[in-house]
Amino acid sequence: MAVKALNPKAEVARAQAALAVNISAARGLQDVLRTNLGPKGTMKMLVSGAGDIKLTKDGNVLLQEMQIQHPTASLIAKVATAQDDITGDGTTSNVLIIGELLKQADLYISEGLHPRIVAEGFEIAKEKALEVLEQVKVTKEMDRETLIDVAKTSLRTKVHTELADILTEAVVDSVLAVRKPGEPIDLHMVEIMEMKHKSETDTTLIRGLVLDHGARHPDMKKRVEDAYILTCNVSLEYEKTEVSAGFFYKSAEEREKLVKAERKFIEDRVSKIIDLKRRVCGDSDKGFIVINQKGIDPFSLDALAKEGIVALRRAKRRNMERLTLACGGTAMNSVEDLTPDCLGHAGLVYEYTLGEEKYTFIEKCDNPRSVTLLIRGPNKHTLTQIKDAVRDGLRAVKNAIEDGCVIPGAGALEVAVANALVKHKPNVKGRAQLGVQAFADALLIIPKVLAQNSGYDPQETLVKVQAEHAESGQLTGVDLNTGEPMVAAAAGIWDNYNVKKQLLHSCTVIASNILLVDEIMRAGMSSLKG
């Protein structure tokens, strides 16, 4: 052992031992996530060192929050979280398939097959699997109904069914609102706002914006209908200079002059806004609202309140962009060239007070290009759970629109691919066939676990589904309510195409990499110090 001679403290695991260590790590991770695949999966409760509780069913959240010691397990966890970052779904399946690929490969390797040959078989199988994926994808018009099915499939695996059905519509409508033809969809234009009250089923989509602060002046109206909205980034307060400068005055009068000049400078700005308001509103009842990114001092607030203008100060930067998209108009950086064209319009603006906090709702916009999902829930972990789910739901809808096609879900794809691989096996040269067989068997973990989590017998269900698939030639998945086979497409259970594609790629690559490890050395520089 060369390493031992050089560094007696090094820990080394060779050939079979190294493989055994890696495979047991993958299986350990698989066992943890196994029970929360699919809509009937179970919850996991994570308690941090500080006693914070997190209830989740989302594989991604679990993997990020769990403290994973084992190097191989953390490698698999990283792949799965990367899958989530890219596509927003498929983390649990990812871990399950990698674990299962290694488990199947282990059967052959323990009989003396070289890991390299298994890895070659995996590679051949992956190419074939991607071909099958291309054949079975369903290209269809992404109308609202299809998108609702896609979002529902994703959301039901994250939160319970009744809530998923409520969230689905909100999620789909919000993506359709911010979508511009021919441009990539920017999900940042959907603001996700949390309010801690009522119950989670009160989560709604607001076609406009919700700001998390209210007006700062007692005389300003709490509710304005049919309002013009001016978004601006102009300071309406006396600001100190950026460098700390001091003035020496010859006399008190000069100081007065300076103060007056500063005051006038700001008053001029305010009066320009007031002029614009008079021009567009005249004597009518229309409201006028100023939303400013910088500060507004009490004098200016007073002047604006007298004119019946509602002013909000210190809005967030990202909300400025959303405001102009939601209500139209342009954001102004100076008050010199204010014209009626730069104003947006909203049908209703009102302030809502919840406990200590104030929220300003801007609703009934004419053609909102930016919307807000208002998530309500009784406590913090419910809110976090819904927020995670909504993010993934938004991503699923976005993927479906951008792919222009979907894949039947409920384990149907996996059954079809496994079937195609078994047929394809005789065309593969030599011992690599065993790798193909291992890949085919490994994919079947998905329908098996789906059935198992719903309380059915995994083997029996799988055999039924395979028989049905062979007979009808249609993509057949598991009906989780009855445990019988069903045509996934007819039931409206759709998965994202790019999630599955990414899944096949990343699982194969990582499983092959782990198989080909034949030495694990813990011999970093740090261990020499001891």
Swiss-Prot record:
Gene3D superfamilies: GroEL (3.50.7.10), GroEL-like equatorial domain (1.10.560.10), TCP-1-like chaperonin intermediate domain (3.30.260.10)
ATP-binding keyword on record: yes
Broad EC category: hydrolase
Location(s), subcellular: Cytoplasm
Family annotation (Pfam families): Cpn60_TCP1
Protein name: T-complex protein 1 subunit zeta
Taxonomic classification: Eukaryota, Metazoa, Chordata, Craniata, Vertebrata
Catalysed transformations (reactions): ATP + H2O = ADP + phosphate + H(+)
Residues reported in the UniProt entry to bind ATP: 38, 90-92, 410-411, 495, 500
EC identifiers of the protein: 3.6.1.-
Keyword entries, A-Z: ATP-binding, Chaperone, Cytoplasm, Hydrolase, Magnesium, Metal-binding, Nucleotide-binding
Keyword Nucleotidyltransferase on entry: no
Major location (coarse): cytoplasm
